[in-house]
C-alpha cells in the first residue's frame, strides 16, 4: 500500500521489517476489530547472500494483539518469510522478536500492560 499513515500507529520493528498488505475491519455486536495484514520484507537473514538462499514463501499467519486504535481492537496478522539454504536444504528464518515471549502481544503492548497492571490493582 502506498499510503504511509500506518507508520504512525505500528511498532517500529514492524515498520522496519514488514510490508503492509491490507487492513480489514470485522464488526460484531460487542466490538470492532481491525486486522492489519503484514508480510515480512524480502531481506536475507544475517550472514547469507543472494546465491546461498531460495525464498520458500511464507509461514502460516500469526495473530498478535497490539494497542487499540480509536476503540477498535487491533490484531496484527503476520506472515514470516521462509528461506531454504541451497547447500543443506534446511529452512531458516530471520531472527526477529516481534511479540513478547510467552504472550500473543506485541512487545510494546505487553510492556504497557505490565507497567500499568500495578496501577490497576
Name these PLM-found stretches.
Residues 1-4, 47-52, 90-92:
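Generic detector of short, locally flexible boundary/turn motifs and exposed helical patches
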Residues 1-44:
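N-terminal alpha-helical interaction blocks
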Residues 18, 22-23, 51-53, 81, ...:
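General N-terminal targeting signals
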Residues 7, 19, 45, 49, ...:
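Compositionally biased, intrinsically disordered low-complexity regions enriched in proline and serine
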Residues 64-121:
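Short, positively charged, Gly/Tyr-enriched micro-motifs
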Residues 2, 11, 37, 56, ...:
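Short linear sequence motifs
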Residues 32, 37-84:
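N-terminal juxtadomain amphipathic helix
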Residues 5, 59-62, 93:
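Residue-level signal for pocket-adjacent positions within structured domains
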Amino acid at each position: 500500500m502506498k499510503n504511509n499513515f500506518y507508520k504512525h500507529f505500528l511498532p517500529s520493528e514492524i515498520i522496519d521489517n514488514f510490508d503492509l498488505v491490507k487492513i480489514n475491519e470485522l464488526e460484531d455486536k460487542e466490538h470492532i476489530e481491525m486486522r492489519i495484514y503484514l508480510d515480512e520484507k524480502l531481506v536475507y537473514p544475517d550472514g547469507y547472500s543472494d546465491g546461498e538462499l531460495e525464498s520458500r514463501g511464507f509461514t502460516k499467519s500469526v495473530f498478535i494483539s497490539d494497542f487499540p486504535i480509536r476503540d477498535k481492537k487491533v490484531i496484527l496478522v503476520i506472515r514470516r518469510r521462509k528461506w531454504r539454504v541451497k547447500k543443506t536444504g534446511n529452512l531458516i528464518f530471520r531472527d526477529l522478536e516481534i511479540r513478547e515471549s510467552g504472550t500473543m502481544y506485541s512487545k510494546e503492548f505487553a510492556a504497557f500492560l505490565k507497567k500499568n497492571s500495578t496501577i490497576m490493582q
